UniProtKB/Swiss-Prot annotation:
Its cofactor is Mg(2+). It comes from Streptococcus gordonii (strain Challis / ATCC 35105 / BCRC 15272 / CH1 / DL1 / V288). This is ATP-dependent helicase/nuclease subunit A. It comes from the Bacteria. One of its GO terms (molecular function) is 3'-5' DNA helicase activity. The keyword Metal-binding does not apply. It catalyses: Couples ATP hydrolysis with the unwinding of duplex DNA by translocating in the 3'-5' direction; ATP + H2O = ADP + phosphate + H(+). Heterodimer of AddA and AddB/RexB.
């Protein structure tokens, strides 16, 4: 298709006017139109929350495609894989719509090609692109294309520890071992071991990974702060601060004496004030530095006289107390400032003398980091496994060192687009620069929503471009989208009222002015509604405030939220699914879960703490594996014996523990167990016959597992344990069984993935797990199906990009995490490293007293500079986190915290400064709640768009909280019936009705509580056909006959259809489908299948390959990100005869999850003549699968397919 020209500025202006005067109900804004159609230069779109940035991106891409640009000519970077998938779906939908409406055949052909190319277009995360680039050009750096990604933090730590230990030993015995020993001691802290130093090395390494070139940054910036330190300039800064503080105090005292001080004439404090003024008056502008420092010292010393009250007004006259308090507060602030300056001078003198002594240590640290970074990289190369940061660095190296590759991409891409630009790090920015031709970048983001500093994202990359383009449009076009189409006006006004008083360049990194104000863009949400007014709710507990931890949420705080949720649900018919609770972190949310359960409100936590390895069922399995690996591990063996698999009680374990043999003084528990079995223990009489049978069963089972482990994979071993002891079924019957089974299933898959790597064997697997736990890491929890209509609980970070009708931001009083400001090392991109240096300071003692020096920790000047920088950055990010949380709400916003009303009212919140909270209050505040309360107090005369309300215990009684009235009449009864009852009469009534219930519900009694889909039809038929009559005829009842035939071991067992079917299912699960698999890939996948060779030979790989030639196979390949394979499910079904529920469990072979439909497919290896036979046989089974999916996702349109592999040719048939 011939390319069309892009709109000129004049044409864009005309389009904006046309849109503004049109009769459309929802019009595009002038800024949206400008962002969609502008071209010819770099463009930065600052898109406020809810301003339709995704709409703008999609429409811009569509417009470029309509002008003849191919989707393959666009580079589109998204922040997450999920965002990339959603963008592709939107593009598919929009292109399909345009294709359907178009009458131009040439355009239709072009659009059809673009639709087909979306799946392979460069739309995805930067990580996915750099992997693709490295697969293609990695050979230029000598890298193999079959590398894998080190995604597990635990595996990374293991490799890092190996490299660190090796390098540490080299340096510790090297030429500079004395300096190195001093370097290590500088960071050991109280632990007195090398873990403190190792922790700092890993922290520096993580920082280096976010730079575009770690080695270059080490050489150019690492020591920059120390190399550029100018002590004379710093001393002059302190002097200027001292001058300003002393003159300010002099003015304050003189003003006081000339005015309100007359009310206190003759008071003792005034003598001291006059004495201070004499000293201050001796100073002149040209006085020496020493004069100023001497007067500072004298005034501070005077302030400490009389127990620190020498300059304090004390009065018993009530009418003068307010004047006295005002003076005392002002005096206190100024004197504290002077004391801080005196301390700074004292510290500065030490720094001048000792800071340079730290340079040899820092030089060596730089060398160590350079060696560590390089050696660790070489170690990863031997494993052919890399971190995402490594992949990015390789990609940058290829683009920088090979101009022909760089030119290829710069010429290929018509435009380089990036979403969520505010969360870009320096590595990603360098990649974007190299892919761009210099004037074809399109960047969309919002600095107010940059909340990933802990991932090394740098919002200043966005901010620098914002300022540059704002000041000089020739450098690039700045477009600001501030209309919010998501939220009601009450949410927008509350957000504006908070941030225009909170955020500026000084504290917040941007000025929240008219440029950034949120404006209602949706006409239907622009009219005020009093019931949607934002609320600031504080739980005023009667408990002493010391007992309420700021870190956790109190039960009272949760109760006030529950009270409001019940009101919304009962009075305003708000669905639970429309309500979301936001917290700052994933941890310490147990109280929320418990309180919601108590009030029968469904709650779904969206992503819990990474505590997979701490789940009971997984811990039991890990102890089982430890015992198989080494039975002499007493802890693991005890855990296994006590588990539900073998159920040994405390008494039985004690009896075993007493079975020590006479010959040995010390024995492990397993050895004592063997003594018990052979009657060789000291107390054989304690081992009773039943007890001995349990021991024999345990011993037999354990030995069989140990034998099996020698010749089979971890995956097979784990499933053998599940099957031998029915452990998988057992945990499924426990509370939260679906989650527990998902955890066990994931353990087998993780073990399988582990053995796919270069690591092999049970011993190394156990070692890896133990190292993970030793380093206080864990693995991510496993997701499972959750109820549809439930309140959601998630972190603010998790909520970014989402929207919810009603939002409760909880635990507003939680103190900000200041951990990064207490580290002994602080890194700055501009200034390099800053450290706390432990110096050997000489002291004057009598000659006989030793030592003659002490170790003194001092904050070096670069450390102090970096600390101020990081404090500002941290506070600014907390402001942005609050902004993200507040702008998630569509209808109503609740800000919830806790605190003593009395104490909050007594606190000083400062004065307004140019319409904002004072800089000191904003920078010293430690929680969201303090910011909100300060704004409410300082600007109490303003008509703020949120209401403050304290809630007390008397407002949260059971009667006042209320209860949920379930629409299902059985729910409340069920909850009551499940509790223990002390009502004896009622219990007798139940007992008397047993016979009647047995008769009435015979079908349900005969029907097991848990079945699989394939068993249901076979099970129902005999029960339903009898219509309640006895199922088994006593005369023809089956009685097993003894069979003494010995097995013939000379003949190999015949391969069964079930074995082939299981192997085929495992094969289809293992085949990678990120691209069309060829025969080599299929053979490799088959080799990994855990089955006998005789079984594998029965599998026709040509049929498997032909599947990917079918329409369904092509759809799978094109939508691999939507594919779910071997997915377990569970759902309730109702027995038609008895009306009772039973649990249906099964595993789906696979399905594709789209936004509006699901494609379900099932593999069948049954032999057949006509496909209709299998359709009839499995129709009901697929219906059950479809019901399960429909219930889980709330999607009614489900396409069902059978993939038939048992005929002469492969067939894919759709089942209606």
């Amino acid at each position: 298709m011939r390319k069309k020209s892009f709109l000129s500025p004049e044409e864009i202006s005309q389009l904006q006017h046309f849109e503004a005067t049109s009769s459309k109900e929802q019009k595009r804004t002038a800024e949206q139109i400008e962002a969609i159609y502008s071209s010819g230069q770099n463009i930065l779109v600052s898109a406020s929350a809810g301003s339709g940035k995704t709409f703008v991106m999609v429409q811009r891409i569509i417009d470029q495609i309509l002008r003849g640009v191919s989707i393959q000519e666009l580079f589109i970077s998204t922040f997450t894989v999920k965002a990339a998938g959603e963008l592709k779906e939107r593009l598919e939908k929009e292109l399909s719509k345009v294709l359907k409406e178009s009458q131009d055949e040439e355009l239709k052909q072009h659009l059809a090609k673009q639709l087909a190319a979306i799946a392979t277009a460069d739309i995805g995360t930067m990580d996915s692109f750099t992997q693709k680039l490295l697969n293609k050009y990695g050979y230029l750096l000598g890298l193999a294309p079959n590398f894998r990604i080190l995604q597990s933090a635990s595996e990374q730590t293991m490799l890092q520890n190996e490299v660190f230990q090796q390098l540490f030993e080299q340096y510790y015995t090297g030429e500079q071992k004395e300096i190195f020993e001093k370097l290590v001691k500088n960071f050991t802290g109280k632990k007195k071991n090398i873990s403190g130093f190792r922790q700092q090395v890993y922290a520096i390494y993580q920082f280096l990974q976010s730079t575009s070139n770690p080695q270059r940054w080490l050489q150019d910036f690492f020591l920059k702060g120390y190399e550029e330190t100018d002590f004379s300039r710093e001393r002059d800064k302190i002097l200027q601060q001292v001058k300003g503080a002393l003159f300010d105090l002099e003015d304050y005292f003189r003003f006081h004496l000339d005015n309100e001080g007359r009310e206190f004439a003759g008071a003792k404090y005034q003598e001291n004030v006059l004495l201070a003024l004499d000293k201050l008056g001796s100073l002149q502008e040209l006085s020496s530095e020493q004069d100023y420092f001497r007067v500072l010292k004298d005034v501070v010393l005077l302030s400490r006289a009389s127990g620190g009250r020498a300059l304090t007004i004390t009065t018993r006259k009530e009418e003068l107390k307010e004047l006295a308090d005002t003076f005392n507060q002002g005096r206190k602030e100024r004197i504290e400032h002077l004391r801080g300056l005196e301390s700074s001078i004292y510290q500065f003198e030490f720094l001048e003398k000792y800071q340079d002594d730290s340079l040899p240590l820092l030089d060596l640290l730089r060398d160590f980091m350079s060696d560590f970074t390089q050696t660790y990289l070489e170690r990863k190369k031997t494993e052919n496994a890399f971190e995402f940061g490594d992949i990015s660095h390789f990609a940058i190296q290829i683009l920088e060192d090979f101009p022909q590759v760089r030119s290829f991409y710069q010429e290929r891409y018509h435009e380089v687009m990036v979403d969520e630009y505010q969360d870009t790090n320096h590595t990603q920015e360098r990649m974007l620069e190299l892919l761009s031709n210099g004037y074809n970048r399109f960047m969309v983001g919002d600095i107010k929503q940059s909340i990933y500093r802990f991932r090394q994202a740098d919002p200043q990359i966005f901010n620098d471009k914002f300022r540059l383009y704002q000041a000089d449009p020739s450098q690039g076009k700045l477009i600001v989208l501030k209309e919010n189409f998501r939220s009601h006006v009450e949410v927008l006004e509350a957000t504006n009222d908070v941030f225009k008083r909170l955020m500026d360049e000084q504290v917040g990194e941007i000025n929240y002015d008219e440029t950034h104000y949120l404006v209602a863009g949706n006409p239907t949400k622009a009219s005020p509604d009093p019931k949607n007014r934002a609320e600031f709710l504080l739980y005023d507990s009667t408990v002493a405030s010391e007992e309420l931890s700021e870190e956790s949420i109190s039960a009272g705080e949760v109760s006030l939220v529950i009270k409001e949720i019940i009101r919304l649900h009962e009075e305003e018919a708000v669905a639970f699914k429309d309500i979301t609770l936001l917290t700052a972190s994933r941890t310490r949310n147990d109280i929320i879960l418990a309180e919601f359960a108590k009030h029968n409100i469904p709650l779904v936590p969206d992503g819990g703490e990474d505590n997979y390895l701490q789940s009971v069922e997984v811990m039991v399995m890990l102890d089982t594996l430890r015992t198989i690996n080494n039975p002499l591990n007493d802890y693991a063996l005890t855990a296994l014996l006590k588990s539900a698999m073998f159920d040994f009680g405390e008494d039985e374990l004690a009896r075993i523990a007493l079975q020590k043999s006479q010959e040995k003084s010390q024995e492990n528990l397993y050895e004592k167990l063997e003594n018990a079995l052979t009657n060789q223990g000291l107390h054989p009489d304690l081992i009773l016959p039943d007890h001995k049978k349990k021991l024999e069963l345990f011993q037999k089972t354990l030995l069989s597992w140990r034998t099996f482990a020698k010749t089979h994979s971890l995956y097979d071993l784990i499933w053998k344990i599940y099957q031998d002891r029915f452990y998988y079924e057992y945990v499924g019957a426990l509370p939260n069984g679906a989650q527990r089974q998902a955890n066990l299933y994931a353990l087998s898959l993780r073990a399988n993935d582990y053995e796919k790597s270069s690591f092999k064997g049970l011993s190394r697997f156990i070692s890896m797990i133990d190292k993970i736990l030793e380093n206080q890491h864990d693995l991510a929890s496993v997701p499972y199906a959750a109820p549809q209509d439930a309140v959601h609980l998630m972190t603010v970070h998790k909520s970014k990009g989402l929207e919810f009708k009603y939002v409760f931001l909880l635990n507003m009083d939680k103190a900000f995490n200041r951990q990064d400001t207490s580290s002994s090392i602080i890194l700055s991109r501009k200034n390099g490293i800053g450290i706390k240096y432990i110096a050997d300071v000489e002291v004057e003692y009598p000659e006989k007293v030793k030592p003659r020096s002490i170790r003194l920790s001092m904050d070096t000047l670069p450390y102090q500079q970096n600390l101020e920088e990081i404090k500002l950055a941290s506070l600014s990010e907390q402001m942005r986190l609050l902004y993200v949380a507040m702008t998630r709400a569509e209808t109503k916003l609740y800000l919830v915290g806790k605190g003593s009303q009395e104490k909050l009212e007594k606190r000083s919140w400062g004065q307004a400064e140019q319409g904002l909270l004072s800089a000191s209050i904003r920078s010293q505040t430690t929680s969201f709640q303090d910011w909100l309360y300060a704004i409410q107090t300082v600007f109490s005369e303003d008509q703020l768009a949120f209401d403050l309300r304290f809630v007390r215990d008397e407002d949260l009684t059971a009667d006042k909280i209320g209860q949920i009235h379930h629409s299902n009449p059985f729910d409340a009864d069920d909850l009551t019936d499940n509790r223990q009852s002390e009502d004896i009469g009622r219990a007798l009534d139940i007992l008397e009705s047993v016979d009647r219930l047995n008769s009435q519900y015979r079908s349900a009694i005969e029907l097991p509580s848990v079945r699989t889909p394939s068993q249901i039809k076979k099970f129902y038929e005999p029960i339903m056909d009898t219509e309640g009559m006895d199922i088994i005829d006593e005369r023809v009842a089956f009685r097993p006959q003894p069979n003494f035939d010995l097995p013939d071991f000379s003949r190999k067992a015949k391969v069964t259809g079930a074995q082939v079917g299981s192997a085929v299912h495992e094969l289809m699960q293992r085949i990678p489908i990120d691209q069309k698999p060829d025969m080599a890939v299929l053979k490799l996948s088959l080799k990994q299948v855990q089955a006998e060779e005789s079984v594998k030979k029965q599998i026709d790989l040509n049929k498997i390959a032909s599947f990917f030639e079918t329409r369904l196979g092509e759809i799978l390949l094109a939508n691999s990100d939507k594919l779910h394979r071997e997915a377990p499910f569970a759902m309730f079904k109702r027995d038609e005869i008895s009306g009772q529920d039973f649990v249906l469990r099964g595993i789906l072979d696979g399905y594709l999850l789209f936004e509006d439909r699901i494609i379900l497919f099932d593999y069948k290896t049954d032999k057949y003549k006509e496909a209709s036979e299998l359709i009839a046989r499995y129709h009901s089974q697929l219906d059950l699968y479809a019901q399960a999916l429909s219930r889980s996702y709330g999607i009614s349109q489900i396409e069902k397919y059978l993939i038939l592999l048992g005929g002469e040719q492969l067939q894919v048939v759709q089942v209606d």
